[in-house]
Amino acid sequence: MMIMKHDYEIDTFGLSCPVPIMKVAEEFKNIPEGSVLKVVASDEGIVEDLRSYCKKTNHEFLSYEISLPEYIVYVRK
Protein backbone atom coordinates (compact mmCIF):
# COMPACT_ATOMS: atom_id res chain seq x y z
CA MET A 1 0.00 0.00 0.00
CA MET A 2 1.38 3.37 -1.08
CA ILE A 3 1.00 6.32 1.24
CA MET A 4 1.06 9.67 -0.51
CA LYS A 5 1.73 12.89 1.33
CA HIS A 6 -1.50 14.85 1.56
CA ASP A 7 -2.69 18.04 3.22
CA TYR A 8 -6.35 17.21 3.77
CA GLU A 9 -8.49 14.10 3.96
CA ILE A 10 -12.19 13.38 3.61
CA ASP A 11 -13.96 10.14 4.35
CA THR A 12 -16.86 9.34 2.04
CA PHE A 13 -16.94 5.65 2.94
CA GLY A 14 -20.49 4.31 2.76
CA LEU A 15 -21.73 7.13 0.53
CA SER A 16 -22.93 6.49 -3.02
CA CYS A 17 -22.50 8.53 -6.17
CA PRO A 18 -22.85 11.48 -6.58
CA VAL A 19 -22.35 12.34 -2.89
CA PRO A 20 -18.55 11.69 -2.75
CA ILE A 21 -17.95 14.06 -5.70
CA MET A 22 -20.19 16.68 -4.08
CA LYS A 23 -18.15 16.36 -0.86
CA VAL A 24 -14.89 16.81 -2.82
CA ALA A 25 -16.28 19.90 -4.57
CA GLU A 26 -17.32 21.35 -1.20
CA GLU A 27 -13.91 20.59 0.35
CA PHE A 28 -12.11 22.24 -2.59
CA LYS A 29 -13.94 25.49 -1.74
CA ASN A 30 -12.25 25.50 1.68
CA ILE A 31 -8.65 24.48 0.98
CA PRO A 32 -5.78 26.45 -0.58
CA GLU A 33 -4.72 26.10 -4.21
CA GLY A 34 -2.05 23.40 -4.60
CA SER A 35 -3.29 21.33 -1.65
CA VAL A 36 -3.46 17.55 -1.97
CA LEU A 37 -6.73 15.95 -0.86
CA LYS A 38 -7.00 12.28 0.09
CA VAL A 39 -10.47 10.85 -0.56
CA VAL A 40 -11.46 7.59 1.12
CA ALA A 41 -14.48 5.91 -0.45
CA SER A 42 -16.35 2.63 -0.71
CA ASP A 43 -18.03 3.43 -4.05
CA GLU A 44 -16.14 1.62 -6.81
CA GLY A 45 -16.96 4.42 -9.26
CA ILE A 46 -14.96 7.00 -7.31
CA VAL A 47 -11.76 6.55 -9.33
CA GLU A 48 -13.31 7.28 -12.73
CA ASP A 49 -15.72 9.84 -11.28
CA LEU A 50 -12.88 11.83 -9.72
CA ARG A 51 -10.71 11.48 -12.83
CA SER A 52 -13.56 12.97 -14.88
CA TYR A 53 -14.32 15.66 -12.27
CA CYS A 54 -10.67 16.77 -12.20
CA LYS A 55 -10.54 16.99 -15.99
CA LYS A 56 -13.68 19.16 -16.06
CA THR A 57 -12.60 21.45 -13.21
CA ASN A 58 -8.87 21.79 -13.95
CA HIS A 59 -7.80 19.98 -10.80
CA GLU A 60 -5.11 17.31 -10.91
CA PHE A 61 -5.87 13.62 -10.48
CA LEU A 62 -2.69 12.27 -8.84
CA SER A 63 -3.13 8.59 -8.02
CA TYR A 64 -5.35 5.97 -6.48
CA GLU A 65 -5.10 2.70 -4.62
CA ILE A 66 -7.60 -0.04 -3.98
CA SER A 67 -7.52 -1.98 -0.75
CA LEU A 68 -11.01 -3.43 -0.61
CA PRO A 69 -13.35 -2.39 0.73
CA GLU A 70 -11.61 1.03 0.46
CA TYR A 71 -10.81 3.08 -2.60
CA ILE A 72 -8.32 5.87 -1.89
CA VAL A 73 -7.82 8.68 -4.38
CA TYR A 74 -5.41 11.62 -4.25
CA VAL A 75 -6.23 14.86 -6.07
CA ARG A 76 -4.62 18.30 -6.11
CA LYS A 77 -6.64 21.48 -6.11
What are these regions (language model features)?
Residues 12, 41, 75-77:
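Hydrophobic residues in beta-strands and at strand termini
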Residues 51-77:
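C-terminal structural segments of small proteins and small subunits
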Residues 7-9, 36-38, 70-72:
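Intrinsic-disorder/low-complexity, polar/charged segments enriched in Ser/Thr/Lys/Arg/Asp/Glu/Gln
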Residues 23, 27-59:
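Amphipathic, hydrophobic secondary-structure cores in small proteins
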Residues 2-31:
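An N-terminal amphipathic alpha-helical segment
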